[in-house]
């Protein structure tokens, strides 16, 4: 803001402030399995993989604070870290069984801040959303809780639909 200000030819009726702020990260479910930094950096393969992720670990500043003299603002927490392609497990979409047996969560899934920083991108949302749709259909067809979906059958259906589940 200090350097560039607001765009002078947009949002004239709101003093040039946008109607809605862009939310990069919101609340997330805490499932039985929480995907974390180790899943995107060291433990890259998963038996229940439903797709691949490869976007950088990308988090903007998490805190801004004034400098000691009060003349500027310092940013903390920026993270831009390249990742090796990693597998996305089906489990990230699963709520705890005691909380819901008929719900898949393809966006506010179970992940830490660091893991979510790479998973929150649209390509991964499309991959996870596709898998959620296939898994939901499979759960309905077999009259099973989403936690009991046969992951082997799910993966076979995803492959048949040309999903990429592992590195070549």
Model segments located where?
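Flavin (FAD/FMN)-binding glycine-rich loop and adjacent Rossmann-like elements that form
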Residues: 1-168
